[in-house]
C-alpha cells in the first residue's frame, strides 16, 4: 500500500575494493543512500547512478544483480531460492531487482562484473564481393574494447580530410552502438565512435526494453539512443565538413525504439512491426539525410539485411526465377547460383540466420536467450562459455548430456581468470540455445534443398571471438562445415555504409531495395513440425 512506505537508509560497504559500482567514491569510504521501502533496491541503485542497469530488466531470472546483506537481510523470495544456492542465501545474498528493504540495512554489491565489450568496427576482407572494402580491411578487423559508456578511436584530422565527402554508418545494437565516418567511394575510415547502448538501464534484452517502453518509458528510450548518435555526429563534424548522409542498421526493436514507435505489437503474437521498410529519420539537428536500413520481419531486422548487403548476398537473384530484374546478379552469387549455398549466422540474444543458393534466400531467427552473451548468472561472454564447456567436455568433467560430475554437480566449477563459477543451469542454458540454433540451421538447409554449403559467415563480435573448433565439439555447427567458417566482422556496419552510398548515388532506392527483400522467404521455426524433434536431437553436447 502507498501509505505503508517509509524512507530508510542503506549503507553500501566499499572497503574491500570488490564493489562493482560506478561511483568515484567506491574506494575507501562507505556510501549512504536514502531508499523508499516500497521500491526495489535496484531502483535506488539506478536512481543514484551506482550501477549501469538491470541485466534482465528486473525480472530476477538472470541472477546477476546480487547484493550481500551484512545487516538487515530480507527473507528470500522463491525466485531467489531458485537462482542461488542455499549457502549463498545463508550468507545474506539477495537480488537487487527483487528485494525491497523495509528497514535500515548494510549491504555490499556483488553484481556480476561487466565484461569488457569488444565492439567490432570493421568487416574482414571479402575480396570476392567488394574490392574496395577488401583493400581497406585486408589487415584485420578493427575493434574497440569498451567497459565504460563511451569509447573513441582517436584519429588525427588532416587538412585534406576536412572537405572529403563522407557518409556515417551506424550499427545500432542492443548492447553497443558503433558509428563510423567513411569516405564515399573508397570506404576509407576517417573516424570511429562507439558507446554502450544506454537503454541497458532497462535491461540487456529487447523484451525488457519493450516492457519498459510500454510502461511509459518510450520517449526516454528514444532520447537515450539519440543522445549517443548526436554525440557521435558532433565528433565527426569536427573531423569533416562534408557529411552527405547517415545510414543506421539495427534490429527491429532497436529501430522502433529509435523512431519512437509503439512497440507493444513486437512483444506479442503475431509480432507485427509498425514499419519494416526503408525509412528516413527527420531531425532538425542534422542537415543531411538519415536512412534506417529496412528489415524483413520482427525478428530479422535491418542489421541482418545490412550484413547480407555487405557480403553481396542480397542480390536480385530471385529475379532469375521471377523474370523481373532490378539489377545485375552480384559477382559472388553468380558463381554459385543453383550449385551450392552460403550461410550467414549472427548470434546474440537472438540467433538470426540466412541461407542462399544464389537463386533463393530463406531467413529465420531463434531465441537464444542470454547463453551466447554469457550464462544466466555466470558472467562469461558467450564465445568464452562455448570454449569452457568444450574444454570441460573434453576433460571428462562434463558429460554429453550437460551434467557436471561430482563434486562439481552440487557445487559448480570455477573457471576462467578472474574465476567465476559455472553451474549446471548455466550449461543447460547454453545447450538450449545451441540446440535451437543447430535445429534452425538444419531446417534452413533442408528447406533450401540440402545443397552443399560453400561458405559460413559468422557475423559480429561473437563470431569474431568464437573458437570454431569448440563450436564443432559441442555440436553448435555440423562437422560438414569444418573449414568453411569465416568470421566476417561487423557486417551490419559495413552494410550500412554500402546502403548509404548506394542511396546517395542512386545505385539503389527505396523501391528497388524493398523489392529485393520481397523475394526473401521467411520461416517461423516454432511452426515447423520437425523443429521439436531436431531440438531434442541436438540438445546433447556432441
Feature-to-residue mapping (PLM):
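Immediate flanking context of iron-sulfur cluster ligation sites
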Residues: 35-63, 70-96
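Conserved phosphate-binding catalytic cores of ATP/NTP-utilizing and phosphoryl-transfer enzymes
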Residues: 125, 146-165, 288-342
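Glycine-rich phosphate-binding loop of actin/hexokinase-like ATP-binding domains
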Residues: 179, 187-205, 264-280, 316-318, ...
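Glycine-rich phosphate-binding loop plus the immediately following alpha-helix
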Residues: 192-226, 289-290, 295-311, 358-400, ...
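Phosphate/ATP-binding catalytic cores across multiple sugar-kinase/actin-like superfamilies
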Residues: 228-236, 304-311, 430-452
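Fe-S ferredoxin-like electron-transfer domains
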Residues: 2-11, 75-168
